[in-house]
Amino acid sequence: MRTISPASIRQHFARAVMPLVVFLLLLAGGVYATNYSLWINGRSSTAQPGNHADFTYWGPASTAAGVNKKSVNWDGFSRVSDQNYRVRDALDCYCTGTNWCYIAAHSAGNLQIGYALSLYGGTARSKKNATPNASGVCGNSDGGTQTGWNIKWVNVAAGAGGGSELANVGSWAVKDPLTSDLKTATARALYDHNQTRAKWFYMYAGSKGTLYSGVLPGQDDEAVAYHSAGGVSGSGGAGFCNPSDWFCNDLTMGTAANEGGKAKWSYHSVKFRDDGEALNHYTNSAWGGVVSKVRADMAANAN
C-alpha cells in the first residue's frame, strides 16, 4: 500500500483551501462584483431627483426590469447640461470599481446618457461604494480612480438623441428649458453622438403615431420620428419608415445604412422597429409603449 507523507498531505490541503481563503478575503474587503440596471427617464414632472428607488416615471417598482434596478431620476425639465451631473453621480455610484451596469434610457434620457459618455466617459472617475445618500451621491470605496464607467450596453426606447420636430415648431405647449435642447439641430449638435466610448446603443423605435404628429417626418411614436429613435446620423432629421411604406426610405435593422444610404451613428444598432405600428412613446407609469420592449429585454438579459 502506498504511503502518503505528511508533507504531501499538507500540500494537497493547501491547494484545496487556498481558493476559499482568497474568496473570503476578497469578500471581507468588499472586493466583489455586482451588476446593476440603471433606468434614465426623459421629460417628467414626477421624477424625484437623486432618489434611485423611485420608479413613478416608469411603472410599478415590483416589475422585473433587470438585475438590481435603479431609477436615475433627473428632473426631466432642465437643460441636459444642467442635470447631467445626476446621471454621472449614478454612473459613479454603480458602474465603477468591480461593479458593472446595464443602462436603459427613454426619450430625452437618450440625450443624457449620450452626453455623459461623449463628454465625460474618458475622464477619471472616483470608485464609489454603491450606497447613495439622499442626493444620489455615493461615498468613495477604496480611494482609487478609473477612466470612465463599466457599462455592458445601453438600451434606448423612443430615443430623442436626434431631437423632435415638435420642439422645432413649438407643438409642445410648454416653455421648459429641456424643449430648447430637444430641437433637432440642437440635440444633434449637443455632443458627438459617434463617441460612445465603444458602448453599444441598442435602439427601440415605436411607430404608433397620430394625426397631430404629422409634423414628424416618416414613421413616429407621437413624439419622436424614426430618424431619432433609430439613431440616424446627420445634422437634421429626415423621413424613415417601415418596409411596408413604399413612399419613404426604410429604417434598417441592426447597424446597416438605411435605405437611401444614410448611416446610423457609430455603435448604434436598431434592435426593434415597430412594423406593426402598435407602440407609442409613453410609459403611462405602467412600463407602457415602446418602453415595454426594453423592459422585457432588460428583464431577460440584464443579469
Regions from the PLM with identified roles:
Residues V17-A28:
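Bacterial N-terminal signal peptides
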Residues R43-S45, N110, A160-G162, K208-L211:
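Short, solvent-exposed loop/turn segments at secondary-structure junctions
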Residues A33-I103, G162-E165, W172:
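Active-site catalytic motif of lipid deacylating hydrolases and related acyltransferases
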Residues N35-S37, Y85-W200:
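Serine-dependent carboxylesterase/thioesterase catalytic core
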Residues Q195-N303:
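C-terminal catalytic-base region of ester-bond hydrolases, centering on the histidine
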Residues M1-H12:
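N-terminal secretory signal peptides that target proteins for export/translocation
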